[in-house]
Every structure is written in C-alpha cells, then in structure tokens.
C-alpha cells in the first residue's frame, strides 16, 4: 500500500473504530484519545494496515503534530510499536492529560516505543522540549536522552531555563516493588519563586550537587546513600553555604542503621523503626499512665519500634536562613534516648547549653522524659536571660494511675 492523502479525517467515533480493531483486548476508547476530538492527517502512507510508515501532519482539536513514523501492530500478541520523529508547537498537553497544572508544549523528539497488553510500555526519547507550561510558568530548553522502561526512567534530562538549570543523569524507578534510585543531580541557580514552585523565597537562588544510590520508598525502608555537596542559598539580605551532607542507611541482622553527617548536624538511629508509627508508639506508652486522657484509637495501629537515637547539633543557621525558623543553637547540643514498644519503655534526654528562640535567650537547658518504673516523668531545667537579669525555671511532672502532678519553680 502506498498513497498520498490530501486529508484523512476521523471523528471521535472513527478513532474508536481504529482502537477496537487494533486492540488485542478492547475495553473501550481510552479517555486520552477521546480528548483528541476530531483527527485528520495529511501526508504519505505506505506499507500494510499492521505495518505502516507515515509522513505528514496530524491535526487534532488540541493542536497539530508533524511526524515521520513507522507504526506496527500485532493483534494476536497485543503489541503496538512505533519509531521515528515527532514535532509539535504549542500543543495543548494539559487538556490532553486532563491536568490543570499543565498547559502547552513544544517539542522535537525521536521516539521508539513498544506497548504490550498488560505490561508497562518501553519508550526511548531523544530530543528537545523547547517549552512546556507547568503551574503557570513556561519552562524552556529541556533536553531528553533516555528510556522509560518497567515504570522507571534511565538516561539524561537537562533543563536550561532563564530561571535556573538542572541536570539529571541516572536511573529512577518508583514503580518497582522496591523503588530504586541511582542518579546524579546538579542544580544551578534555580529560582523556585520565579518558577512558580513556591510562594516563598522571592529573589532567592539555590544551587547544589546531589548523588543518590539507594533503594526503598521511605526513610525506614532506605538502604544506600545520599550525598549532597555545595548547597548554596543566596537572597538579597542573606546567604547560606553547606559544604557536604551525607545520609547512609544499612541493615544488619534485621536491624536498620541510619546515619546523617554534616557540619550542622550529626545523627544516628539504630534498631527497628517506622517513622510513621512513632506518634502511635508514644501515645501507646503514655496511655498506660493516663488512660482517661489518651483514649485508644478506633483502629489500632501496630507498632514495632525498638531503637536508639543520638543527635548532635552544632549549628542551626540553615533553619533560620532557608526555612525562616527563628531558632539558633550557639553551642554543641545533644538529644539522645531510646524507644522500645515491646517493653513499653522510652527515654529522651537533651542538653542545650545556649540557644535562642525568637527573642528568648536560654542557657543551661535540659530536658528528660522517661518511664523507669510504674510512672512516667518529665523534667525541664533552663535559665531564661533577661535584660535586667535571669530567671531560673524548673518543671517536674509525673503521671501514674490517671493522676498527673506538676511542680514549677522559678
């Protein structure tokens, strides 16, 4: 078969007819194809109905696409494949995907794809996305060179926009049973406010290098390492630079070890932990002493936390400079302890020699919370510095058998 088509038109019903005849297991017309509206093609067609080469222009209600593609299908195997070049200008991508965050897209790409029924598609992409609208901002100059396979992407993505550049190279797969991440990211002078990613940080820029090689979909499942180098934040009235931060997670004999090392914070957690069940663990222990105040949840949450933690705080400039948290720790402070769901035991012990929260200056701060026997107790000691002196505060609280006693001295 060979021919030149001055115009081949298909309505939405016509598109449905084609889908029904090309599909191995027809379950109706996909919504994304229905949104195309009326479809027309002008150009050249050659080959067979199941193996067609097309060259020309495809017009839909959402925009036009220039293409030079080979389309193949095998209905018995549920296979649909394509390869070639596609190009479009200001195509209404948001309407096609029914996503209000997206707008129009302009690209020139080489594509190779295979779709098999009941399997994730395999798509290779190489070329340039000249522009794409996201969150009311038009991103420019995105280079793609990679493969989408088994729900993940392996390759390179580079953004070279007036409001920042981002380079990604590696493999990311969040669709696998155990998510995997192995990539390098270089962020240079990204302005998140101007990119409409946040309402914060006007006139601020971020730069960093991030290398990740780990598995797991959450902190307590993570095995591997994340390394952040040269984090730089600049704004008209403030700046921050962090040389390095390393997060390493390992697992031995069924117990996790998570370590964070940086110039402002060093922390380690060892044992069995699930961060999303930690609030439930705390409430379960406290409920033992004040059951009338802390009622059991309608749907009990299983908790199996049994871990030690040790945190050393050296500098909190990152909190006040980047996150606008009005907390400053002036000297080495510590927070350590343990949780044990099986034994219903906890201990939290902290020492803060000198810190400031908003306009409050505190020295000799100490906190202790533990339940060594048949009661739970908390102690707080601190000195609140004033312009005309200082106030020493002491708080002791204890709970047992639904009774709470508190003593405050100053």
Which residues does each PLM region occupy?
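Interface amphipathic segments
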Residues: 1-410
């Amino acid at each position: 078969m060979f021919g030149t088509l001055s115009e081949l038109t298909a309505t939405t019903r016509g598109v449905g007819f084609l889908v029904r005849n090309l599909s191995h297991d027809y379950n109706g017309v996909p919504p994304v194809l229905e949104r195309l509206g009326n479809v027309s093609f002008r150009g050249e067609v050659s080959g067979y109905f199941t193996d067609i080469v097309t060259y020309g222009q495809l017009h839909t209600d959402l925009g036009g696409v220039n293409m030079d593609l080979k389309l193949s299908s095998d209905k018995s195997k549920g296979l649909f494949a394509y390869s070639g070049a596609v190009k479009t200008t200001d195509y209404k991508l948001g309407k096609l995907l029914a996503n209000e965050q997206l707008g129009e897209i302009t690209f020139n790409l080489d594509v190779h794809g295979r779709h098999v029924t009941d399997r994730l598609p395999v798509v290779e992409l190489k070329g340039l996305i000249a522009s794409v609208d996201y969150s009311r901002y038009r991103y420019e100059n995105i280079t793609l060179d990679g493969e989408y396979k088994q729900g993940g992407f392996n390759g390179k993505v580079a953004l070279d926009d007036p409001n920042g550049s981002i380079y990604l190279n590696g493999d990311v797969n969040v669709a696998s049973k155990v998510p995997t991440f192995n990539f390098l990211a270089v962020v240079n002078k990204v302005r998140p406010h101007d990119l409409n990613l946040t309402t914060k940080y006007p006139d601020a820029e971020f730069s960093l290098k991030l290398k990740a090689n780990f598995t797991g979909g959450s902190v307590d499942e993570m095995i591997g390492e994340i390394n952040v180098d040269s984090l730089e934040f600049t704004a008209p009235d403030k700046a921050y630079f962090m040389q390095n931060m390393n997060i390493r997670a390992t697992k031995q004999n069924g117990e996790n070890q998570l370590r964070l090392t940086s110039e402002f914070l060093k922390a380690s957690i060892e044992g069995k932990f699930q961060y999303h069940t930690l609030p439930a663990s705390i409430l379960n222990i406290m409920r033992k002493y004040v059951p009338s105040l802390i009622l059991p949840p309608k749907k009990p949450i299983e908790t199996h936390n049994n871990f030690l933690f040790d945190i050393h705080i050296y500098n909190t400039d990152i909190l006040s400079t980047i996150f606008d948290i009005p907390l400053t720790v002036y000297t080495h402070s510590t927070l350590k302890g343990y949780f044990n769901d099986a034994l219903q035991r906890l201990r939290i012990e902290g020492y803060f020699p000198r810190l400031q929260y908003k306009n409050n200056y505190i020295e000799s701060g100490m906190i202790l919370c533990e339940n060594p026997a048949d009661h739970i107790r908390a102690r707080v000691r601190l000195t609140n510095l004033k312009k005309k002196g200082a106030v020493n505060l002491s708080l002791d609280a204890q709970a047992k058998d639904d009774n709470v006693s508190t003593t405050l001295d100053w």
